[in-house]
Amino acid sequence: MPFSKLGRNKSQRRALLRTLMTDLIVQEKIMTTESKAKELQKLADKMVTLSKKNTLHTRRQAKRHLFDEKINDDTTVLQKLFKNISSKYLDRQGGYTRVIKTVPRRGDSAPMAIIAFV
């Protein structure tokens, strides 16, 4: 199977990954379950690769996977991805994110991980 279903149907899974991707770009590091982090890592690497091309078409493709909300008064999530994050990785060919396993969650002992940009 090329992807994990994360215990959700297609629309719920897409909304979850969209929210996690938006949060990752805004905060540049988030803590989530290990399986969600691994799925998000695939999407995040594709998004950074898209942002390095920086054309109208790639902006529209990236907008499909993000909530383009304002971070502060003059910056949106899409602008941060295409200006700040992509400029860090111009010479890098892949592996833009890393997943670090942490201690299990206290309530249900779910395996947790931190996903962050390298």
UniProtKB/Swiss-Prot annotation:
One CC-aspect GO term: large ribosomal subunit
GO biological process, one term: translation
The species this protein was found in: Aster yellows witches'-broom phytoplasma (strain AYWB)
Keywords linked to the UniProt accession: Ribonucleoprotein, Ribosomal protein
InterPro entries hit by this protein: Ribosomal_bL17, Ribosomal_bL17_CS, Ribosomal_bL17_sf
Similarity remark: Belongs to the bacterial ribosomal protein bL17 family.
Gene: rplQ
GO molecular function, a single term: structural constituent of ribosome
Protein known as: Large ribosomal subunit protein bL17
